[in-house]
């Protein structure tokens, strides 16, 4: 019996129970009100719910009385072994062994689809992440967003959302000016400009620009030279960024140029729309947006008195452009230095008549520190002053790098110790999880060699405590995925597969799939092979959601 099966049956029972009572019609019952949770003490059953306490007040009866009626009806379900009412009205549910064990068959038959849901079915989501300007290799903070953002996109898609991965960048701003001046200075053998970019990559890009230029670049004026380095240098740097991200397993559907906002008229349309809504005013020759109406600490200049657009004008045009493209939900991932950006963005959303936190969410990520044996890693020789994606991948590989960046909440500072990630021991979390998958595959190979197959399935035989614990965790996977999608927290999936791996290793040490010596193959062995393969599938599904491979051998 799967969690959705039990939840659906419980909802029907609750609806009937409420409907038989005065005031029952006044309760707006919905399936999402019925929540099943794992009891902390497994002696209290497989599942628990507090639904009786949630509906007791409008029904005018005690929670325990309502819980008793619900428990009686639940106890009549053939898959339920026992139902108890505890405390003020908790309902504890114990499933029949066969009903609990049947999940293994369901998972194997479902394959990659197990864990997927429908909570975001049909919703169009724009997920903007990384969005670094092409002035150098991606630093470790951007790499964190690459791993977290791609994982979040996978999880949102697993819940049915139509997700567009988007990368926003400006190839004509002041950072690009500094980048172009740095390239030109490198070519001319001059000192790096005071506000320029250093590192060996500047010389490499400058050389490639010169090699690719058709003609004598030194015959150009300095201004013309700088324009060549600006255009070709940013194209080369951005091409490198795209390739490095692709090699890291991160690809984007849309690369959005800031300039296109002005060229397409999106900024003008946004200002016109906000003017119609009465939120724009003129003062001191400038055009302002009255964001204080919506909780911002001050009103914001949109068009300066010089006629030049202020920074927020691009935000206005970009948000309107996304809404015009049909995105109901927009998620932006930003670094810790953008914390002050949130208030004005949410005020902007409200000024458009939308709902902050629904139509726009902003996720703020914290710093990443790279260590080796507890000591800070030296900066990249190529990038000069930052630790880059290449540094991480060269040290530990794509899988370990991605997993390390995803397994912790993005709003917390993160220390990654390369020495730990290089170990083939249980101290290394990615090894621990991948080894669990490889072990399930080894069990399959050994089972085949010993004549154990899945020709029989007797779930009532899966009664060992480690089997009950393992089945309980397997039941949790769809809920974990849905929760990770709702809360925008991919680390929940990573932590779940770690817990599942630990439970599997304990089961492996206690329960044999392959018979010893001359021992005959029994239905218990065959049924345990189903359970082994169910774990293999769920570990693979979980790792796929965070963009990490599931090796068959290690």
From Swiss-Prot:
CDD domains named among the record's database cross-references: ArgRS_core (cd00671)
Keyword Lipoprotein: no
Subcellular location: Cytoplasm
Any one GO molecular function term: arginine-tRNA ligase activity
Keywords from the UniProt entry: Aminoacyl-tRNA synthetase, ATP-binding, Cytoplasm, Ligase, Nucleotide-binding, Protein biosynthesis
Coiled-coil ranges per UniProt: none
GO cellular component: cytoplasm
Motif 'HIGH' region, residue range(s) on this chain: 132-142
InterPro entries assigned: aa-tRNA-synth_I_CS, Arg-tRNA-ligase, Arg-tRNA-synth_N, Arg-tRNA-synth_N_sf, ArgRS_core, DALR_anticod-bd, Rossmann-like_a/b/a_fold, tRNAsynth_Ia_anticodon-bd
A Gene Ontology biological process term: arginyl-tRNA aminoacylation
Catalytic reaction annotation: tRNA(Arg) + L-arginine + ATP = L-arginyl-tRNA(Arg) + AMP + diphosphate
Catalytic activity, EC: 6.1.1.19
ATP-binding is among the record's keywords: yes
Main location: cytoplasm
Domain of life: Bacteria
Top-rank EC class of the record's enzyme: ligase
Pfam families attached to this UniProt entry: Arg_tRNA_synt_N, DALR_1, tRNA-synt_1d
Subunit structure: Monomer.
Assigned protein family: Belongs to the class-I aminoacyl-tRNA synthetase family.
Protein name from the UniProt record: Arginine--tRNA ligase
Biological source species: Clavibacter sepedonicus
């Amino acid at each position: 019996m799967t969690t959705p099966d039990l939840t659906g049956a419980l909802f029907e029972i609750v609806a009937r129970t409420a409907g038989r009572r005065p005031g029952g019609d006044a309760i707006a019952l919905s399936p999402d009100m019925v929540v099943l949770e794992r009891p902390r003490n497994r002696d209290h059953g497989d599942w628990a719910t507090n639904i009786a306490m949630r509906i007791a007040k409008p029904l005018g009866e005690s929670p325990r009385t309502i819980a008793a009626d619900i428990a009686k009806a639940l106890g009549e379900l053939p898959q339920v072994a026992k139902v108890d009412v505890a405390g003020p009205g908790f309902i504890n549910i114990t499933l029949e062994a066969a009903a609990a064990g049947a999940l293994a068959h369901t998972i194997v038959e479902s394959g990659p689809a197990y864990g997927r849901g429908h909570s975001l079915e049909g919703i169009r989501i724009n997920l903007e992440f990384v969005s670094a300007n092409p002035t150098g290799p991606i630093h470790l903070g951007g790499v964190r967003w690459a791993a977290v953002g791609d994982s979040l996109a996978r999880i949102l898609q697993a819940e049915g959302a139509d997700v567009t991965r988007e990368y926003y960048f400006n190839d004509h701003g002041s950072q690009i000016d500094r980048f172009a001046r740095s390239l030109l200075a490198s070519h001319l053998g001059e000192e790096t400009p005071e506000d320029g970019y250093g590192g060996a990559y500047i010389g490499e890009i400058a050389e490639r620009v010169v090699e690719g230029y058709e003609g004598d670049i030194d015959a150009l004026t300095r201004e013309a030279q700088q324009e060549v380095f600006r255009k070709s240098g940013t194209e080369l740097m951005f091409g490198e960024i795209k390739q490095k991200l692709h090699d890291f397993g991160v690809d984007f559907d849309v690369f959005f140029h800031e300039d296109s906002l002005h060229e397409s008229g999106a900024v003008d349309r946004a200002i016109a729309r906000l003017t119609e809504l009465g939120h724009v005013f003129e003062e001191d020759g400038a055009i302002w947006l009255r964001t204080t109406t919506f909780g911002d600490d001050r009103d914001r200049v949109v068009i300066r008195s010089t006629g030049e657009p202020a920074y927020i004008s691009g935000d206005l045009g970009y948000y309107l452009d996304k809404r015009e493209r049909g995105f109901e939900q927009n998620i932006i991932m930003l670094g810790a230095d953008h914390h002050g950006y949130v208030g004005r963005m949410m005020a902007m959303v409200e000024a458009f008549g939308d709902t902050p936190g629904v139509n726009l969410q902003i996720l703020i990520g914290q710093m990443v520190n790279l260590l080796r044996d507890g000591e800070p890693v030296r900066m990249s020789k190529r990038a000069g002053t930052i630790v880059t994606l290449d540094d991480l991948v060269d040290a530990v590989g794509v899988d370990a790098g991605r997993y390390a960046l995803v397994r912790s909440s993005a709003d917390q500072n993160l220390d990654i110790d390369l020495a730990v990630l290089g170990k083939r021991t249980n101290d290394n979390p990615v090894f621990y999880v991948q080894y669990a998958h490889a072990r399930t595959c080894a069990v399959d190979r050994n089972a085949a060699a010993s004549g154990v197959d899945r020709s029989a399935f007797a779930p009532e035989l899966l009664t060992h405590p480690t089997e009950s614990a393992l089945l309980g965790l397997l039941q949790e996977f769809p809920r974990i995925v849905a929760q990770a999608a709702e809360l925008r927290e991919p680390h929940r999936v990573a932590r779940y597969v770690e817990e599942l791996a630990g439970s599997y290793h304990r089961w492996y040490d206690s329960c044999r799939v392959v018979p010893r010596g001359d021992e005959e193959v029994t239905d218990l062995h065959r049924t345990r092979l189903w359970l082994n393969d169910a774990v293999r599938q769920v570990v693979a599904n979980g790792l796929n959601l965070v963009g990490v491979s599931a090796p068959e051998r290690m």
